[in-house]
């Protein structure tokens, strides 16, 4: 049903790569970029209300529409008949692809993807785990899901078990070794790219991806990064406006002109940056895992230190 999948990791350039692949005539990219079909651990019935507001599922109205379905970023597809609909116009010589970044983390995806799709290729971008976690934190802060400092939120997040839709998983999604080991034994053809190398030379990276997928070579569609991060000045106020019933009511009843001014005023003038002390502290969560990953991959990852 699917020929190749971009399996992760979140905040590591997967949306940019998916955007490039969508422009390739040899690829039929899914109408839902991240359908999460093979990650059975992800259950919207158990997601927090705040998480669901940021990451809503595709509802019955969406599926009632005729093909081709409108493009959307994410859903939690469980029915095979619905999963098949996300490639309505795939040609016989096109690769059917999707880009669920939950898959690298998901044991069920590593177990079931290759079993259901013999010969499937799995592509993963791995990023410096501290930078990945910090980028994830900035996104969560922008959406009002956290309001503490990066280290405070990383400490809090790492103290519990990973649970998609209930926690942010800043730490868990930056621990790569177990997932890499699972996917190496999954039966899928695993292709691994290092984010820092890939986007330092995007033209060479794009050529490598096309070769790995058996695609004819075309020029890089664009060099711009998709979904660049923005920061907010007042994360507690953002959380109130987006997730408290009164805040949502007030925002919903604002005149559009006032709402646009409020949004502009809420943006921080400068991006958040890690201090050296914060980076050193955060690295302690990931150092042992990176050392283990080096052994599994058989390569040096000192570019992350």
Language-model regions: role of each:
Residues 1-94, 99-100, 116, 129-135, ...:
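PAPS-dependent sulfotransferase catalytic core
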Residues 13-14, 83, 97, 113, ...:
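Generic structural signal for small/hydrophobic residues in well-ordered secondary structure
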Residues 32-33, 181-280, 298-305:
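The conserved 3'-phosphoadenosine-5'-phosphosulfate
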Residues 68-70, 96-101, 158-172, 229, ...:
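Surface-exposed cleft-lining segments at the edges of enzyme active sites
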Residues 75-89, 144-221:
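PAPS-dependent sulfotransferase catalytic domain
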Residues 105-123:
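ATP-dependent NMP and nucleoside kinases share a basic, alpha-helical "lid"
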Residues 105-108, 134, 203:
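Short N-terminal helix/helix-N-cap motif within the alpha/beta-hydrolase-1
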Residues 127-130, 199-200:
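Canonical radical SAM enzyme core domain
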């Amino acid at each position: 049903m699917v020929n190749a999948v971009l399996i992760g990791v979140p905040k590591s350039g997967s949306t940019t790569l998916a955007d490039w692949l969508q422009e390739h005539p040899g690829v039929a990219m899914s109408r839902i970029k991240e359908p999460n079909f093979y990650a059975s651990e992800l259950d919207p019935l158990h997601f927090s209300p705040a998480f669901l507001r940021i990451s809503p599922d595709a509802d019955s109205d969406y599926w009632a529409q005729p093909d081709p379905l409108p493009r959307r970023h994410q859903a939690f597809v469980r029915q095979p008949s619905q999963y098949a609909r996300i490639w309505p116009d795939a040609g016989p010589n096109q690769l059917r692809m999707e880009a669920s970044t939950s898959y690298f983390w998901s044991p069920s995806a590593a177990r079931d993807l290759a079993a259901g799709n013999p010969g499937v290729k799995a592509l993963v971008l791995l990023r410096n785990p501290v930078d990945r976690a910090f980028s994830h934190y900035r996104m969560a802060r922008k959406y009002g899901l956290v309001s503490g400092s990066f280290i405070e939120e990383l400490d809090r997040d790492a103290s519990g078990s990973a649970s998609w839709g209930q926690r942010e998983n800043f730490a868990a999604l930056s621990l790569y070794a177990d997932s890499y080991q699972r996917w190496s034994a999954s039966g899928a053809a695993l292709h691994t790219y290092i984010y820092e190398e890939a986007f330092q030379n995007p033209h060479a990276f794009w050529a490598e991806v096309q070769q790995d997928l058996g695609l004819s070579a075309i020029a890089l569609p664009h060099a711009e990064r998709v979904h660049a991060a923005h920061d907010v000045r007042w994360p507690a106020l953002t959380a109130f406006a987006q997730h408290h019933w009164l805040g949502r009511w007030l925002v919903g009843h604002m005149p559009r002109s006032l709402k646009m001014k409020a949004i502009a005023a809420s943006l921080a003038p400068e991006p958040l940056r890690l201090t050296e002390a914060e980076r050193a502290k955060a690295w302690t969560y990931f150092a042992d895992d990176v050392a283990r990953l080096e052994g599994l991959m058989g390569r040096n990852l000192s570019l992350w230190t």
